[in-house]
């Protein structure tokens, strides 16, 4: 047990690989005495070949592989439960035992502050197969600040924001499941309100879409939101034109406002269709 705790502590002090983008990884590689092209080799192993163990990165020198293993945590999430359905859907319960770094929020909801995922807390992600598609349904927060009555995620309120790396790692872990060749689509429809964790979510989308990352086209990435007007307006200027889905789960505004939603939907819809013009 002591050895396990020691390894966990060591890993928590290492930089998380999925928090790197191409530029930051290149800077880290050069700073640590490796040639620039090592960046492309590492990215190819992780995103093209699905390899997260430096020991298997055979086109790197033995010294480089050892150094990477000692200084970079290629994965931080630990799967504590794995459920499968008869239709091929698979759900992972992932524990972020190493904790998370604070992430900034948009300020669109006053109750959302700078928060972090506490040690040992968990999020869910789901693989949804359909013919040739392999869709990753991922979480952006631990809990949710909105508190829609139809959704269990918000029962305990918001406990923390996930980092960009933790969001990206969910896609990687789902891609490691048996029989999954590659993830073709991503939907932000898991735990949390994505636009309330704007900086981390948009950073994650950049990696999901980038040619050096997962290379998933923008039209295959969907962000679902209850509708945060300030964040929606900002998101309209985001450089990657992903699909924005408004979460509508009631037939009229009275039910939405009074029974389900903490946010006034009429204002949201007006803002979406006229305020962004």
Question: Model features per residue range: what roles?
Answer:
Residues 5-133:
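Flexible, acidic/Gly-rich N-terminal and inter-domain linker regions that tether
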